[in-house]
Structures are given as structure tokens and as C-alpha cells.
């Protein structure tokens, strides 16, 4: 498809909208929506009404529940940029609260070591990190495999608590005693992570 013209838009024209989401990435998305909607003839009031009615989507900083004062989030982030933007947004939404990142290398991107350094740096933005085994590891040539143990070792060198655990139960056994009221636990996976969200909430409800 060929574009016959290019238009440039100034930021002030599309600033000042209120959106019910946190994070710079969501603000940029909202600005792009406002540009498109304006081109389609919608007024500023109509655009704002649309933002006001938007409640977000599942698996994007989705609150799965709260127990014992701990908030458990689910997020689909499975590449370094998404992890960075989401952890920053969590800190914006939940200021002065500890953020724990639980990461499952399950997507084709995160199972491979092409982003080993970037994934490590992204997760290190959290206050504590748990990484589980690489999904379907045997399908990958050894030289392409992500090394979660090395990720954890590097994060520890930065002074952050980090642990590699083979499965969800092992993570929960280690993590649950460390949690305190006000903590935020963010689960990052493009899969179900062995139901870790509900299992964590169940454990916390018994504390």
C-alpha cells in the first residue's frame, strides 16, 4: 500500500487528554489514537469521552486480586521494551511500594538468548526478581538458549534479590514469606505460568 501524503502533527494539539491508564507507553498510544480520531472528524469532547469509557484490556497490568495487602498483577509483556515500560508504569501507579517481578521465558523471543542482556536489565528495574525455567527448552539449539541462572546472577550483582526457580510452586515457597503489606507482585508471561497468580493469592489469603 502506497501513502500519497504525509502529515505532521504538533504535540500541543493533542496534549491534555485524560486517560485511565498509567505509563508513558499508554500516553503515546493515546496521542496516536487522538490523531487518528481527529482525522476521522471526531471532536476533542468525543475523543475524551472515548478515553473516559475505556477500562483497559486483559493481561495488561491487569489486577488479578489482592490478599494480605499484596496486589497481584498479570501482564503479557514478553520482550525487553514491554518489561521496561510496564515496570515503570507499575511504579507510577503504585508509588513507594515494592515491586516483585515473576518472569516466565515462554515466548519465542524470550526463550532465546538474543535478548539475554536486555531482559536482565529490564527485570532489574524491579525490587525483587524470580525467573523460572525456559519453556520447551529442548526444542532450541543449546547455543540459542536463554540462560535464566545467569540472568539471576547478574541481577544479584546489582544488589537486587533474585532467584531462579524451576516451577511456580518453588517460586511461591520462596516468595510468600518475603512479602509484606503494600507489595506489588507482577507476573510476566504470555502463558498461564502454571496458574501462579491464583496460587499466590490463595497462599496469601491463608497468612
Question: What are these model-derived regions, one by one?
Answer:
Residues 6-11:
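Conformationally flexible catalytic loops at phosphate/diphosphate-handling active centers
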Amino acid at each position: 500500500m502506497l501513502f500519497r501524503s504525509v502529515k505532521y502533527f504538533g504535540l500541543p494539539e493533542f496534549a491534555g487528554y485524560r486517560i485511565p491508564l498509567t505509563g508513558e507507553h499508554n500516553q503515546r498510544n493515546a496521542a496516536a489514537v487522538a490523531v487518528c480520531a481527529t482525522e476521522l472528524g471526531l471532536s476533542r469532547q468525543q475523543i475524551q469521552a472515548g478515553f473516559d469509557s475505556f477500562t483497559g484490556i486483559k493481561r495488561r497490568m491487569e489486577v488479578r486480586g489482592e490478599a494480605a495487602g499484596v496486589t497481584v498483577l498479570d501482564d503479557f509483556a514478553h520482550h525487553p521494551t514491554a518489561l521496561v515500560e510496564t515496570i515503570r508504569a507499575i511504579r507510577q501507579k503504585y508509588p513507594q511500594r515494592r515491586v516483585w517481578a515473576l518472569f516466565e521465558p515462554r515466548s519465542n523471543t524470550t526463550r532465546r538468548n538474543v535478548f539475554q542482556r536486555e531482559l536482565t536489565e529490564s527485570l532489574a528495574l524491579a525490587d525483587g526478581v524470580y525467573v523460572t525455567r525456559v519453556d520447551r527448552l529442548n526444542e532450541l539449539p543449546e547455543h540459542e538458549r536463554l540462560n535464566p541462572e545467569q540472568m539471576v546472577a547478574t541481577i544479584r550483582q546489582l544488589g537486587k534479590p533474585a532467584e531462579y526457580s524451576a516451577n511456580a510452586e518453588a517460586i511461591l515457597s520462596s516468595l510468600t514469606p518475603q512479602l509484606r503489606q503494600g507489595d506489588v507482585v507482577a507476573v510476566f508471561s504470555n502463558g498461564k505460568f502454571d496458574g501462579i497468580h491464583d496460587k499466590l493469592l490463595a497462599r496469601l489469603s491463608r497468612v
